[in-house]
Amino acid sequence: GTAGVTVLMPDPDIRGAGQDAQLAMALLRNPAVLAYTASNQATQVGPHVGTAQLGGDPQEWLYQYPGILRTQHNAVGVGLINSSPELDGVVRRLPLVVGSGGKLFPSFALEMLRVGVGDPSYQISTKETGIEWLRIPSFPVINTDSNSRIWITSNINFHRQTAAEFIQQPMEGAAFVIFGVTAEGVVNPVPTAGGAKYPHELQANVLHHLINGTSPVQPVWAPAAELGVALLLILILLVTASHVYFSAPIFITSIGALIYGSLHAYESSYL
């Protein structure tokens, strides 16, 4: 299987360079994807993964950072664990790609998927309205919003093990394993619509949707479609308002159609 570690290690080990050397050797024996983060306080650019770009330039649509906090440890892949909180401070969507120094950098979950199938790069498609989709060969197309973000969900259960349980009885047969920290004061949980989640839980959530092709996403045409449907229904109700025998059935039918359409869009991963 493919292993990933969401613990950030941007600085040398305070116990000495020997500890970093031991970690580097361990990563040579057991390849893993490491987590990096894009930062407004960094100026250097991290390791770059090749990208096949289709359509326009995606840089103008992506979240941009001046630098990437990085380390020199051996790793088969590196992915970013940055989140993008909404106006209320709650994280509901995560970017799959960000920009820095004129280059593209994939998220941790996307990098886990790329390394898992052994592909040297991933594909990104950009249209006039923004980022349209990303793709790892052998897996479904990943539809995103115009900024390459997808929605996270809170209804997925994962098999979990503590470090002590893993040492006594290591997990076997898993295609992907993500290691994270839950110690208070060491890592801060991320506020989400489903409650506080640890970074490795968010990445596991995104990875699950990427593998199954079920990541909820709001297409760029969704706001215009919602406005158009609302105006059409209002116009129909205004025309039939003086005839209750017409307006009542139309109103009930409209409510039912909106509920059915919303459920269908959600099940189709378009909402």
Language model features by range: what are they?
Residues 1-138, 171-251, 256:
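Non-transmembrane functional regions of envelope-associated proteins
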Residues 124-168:
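Substrate-access "cap/lid" subdomains that shape
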Residues 254-266:
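Aromatic-anchored segments of alpha-helical transmembrane domains
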